[in-house]
Amino acid sequence: MTSRNLRAFSQWSLAAAVLLFNALAASAQDLSNQSIASTTAPVMFQFVVTPDIGSIGSLSADSENNIWATALTNSVALHFNGSTWTKSAMAKASRVNKVAVISPTNVWAVGQGTNDKFSQIQRFNGSAWRVVPSPHFTNGESLNSLKAVAPNNIFAVGVSLDGLKNRLPLVEHFDGSKWNVVVVPNITGGELTDIAAISPSDIWAVGATGGATPAALTLHFNGQQWSRVSAPSASLLAVTALATNNVWAAGVQLGRGPVIEHWNGTAWKVVTSPTIDASAVLNSIRAISPNDIWAAGCNACGDVGGSNPALIEHWDGTAWSINPSPVQLGGLAANALLTFPLTKRIYVGGFAFSSFGASSFLMEGVE
């Protein structure tokens, strides 16, 4: 099972469909993206001992002493208080896709409710996780990610189904009192998988449109309305934003493997990155600075018989290169990244998969 399949193995997973087609596609084509040597020393990641929660699908923090990691399934999370990782029971859910930490008493998570047809939003108030009322569509919807611009300005993105069961991009907004559906371009087959913000009037959401050849879906919010911006063909699974003219997205191209795209303030363009197996995927991307950006995913996604390390790539301001990853029995799929610019500490979370099942893993490295 691939990392995104485990994240969203239900009817909602556009990304899972992409990976299925990808795994069946021909071997990787020559993209003229040969492996690139890094000009900086690699970060030596080490496994962090934590309770096993089956998988880590998301990481977020407001400081290095208040870190949350949520499981994709099992309705459980991990919390780090600066010295110890402990389990935290969440509200019952079929899936939790993303977590966002605002403060020790204000943490949000989005995913799917217990019946998997409808999305679920829950909040941690410092003592317990509780479900928060949110909009629902007759035919259902899914929320894949969220971004807290401020406590009273939170966006969640995903996909809904219309009366004809067509997939449509979905954005919801929390104004400090309640969640509401936001008007976005009506793009049939569209799904949003991640969101990043530079300011309240400069926000990006990325994803893909369905079909035999998925196309990139990038939406921009200027503080007033959402509009579609064209981007090279790909299924974009993650986005990180540094400045108005410096936004990065990562994902997968059908039959070709991982893709990284960059917004320079004018246009989205594919940036050369190392050649990987066609079944490899980048699930997460996070920036420390313009010359220090990290992306993570899986190498031979779904190969439960191998011992493939997690896929970790680094941008040093000039080129993308592969950073070594620890190896353990079974394959490793990274779903989540967390970076701390001041200390240059990086966390990578995901799951180890083998014929015996899946277990969560967390790695830590310091530049």
PLM segments and residue spans:
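Residue-level hotspots at or immediately adjacent to binding/recognition sites across diverse folds
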Residues: 29-367
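Initiator methionine at the very start of the polypeptide chain
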Residues: 1-2, 29
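Bacterial N-terminal signal peptides
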Residues: 12-23
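Short, low-complexity N-terminal tether/leader segments at secretion or assembly junctions of large
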Residues: 23-24, 30
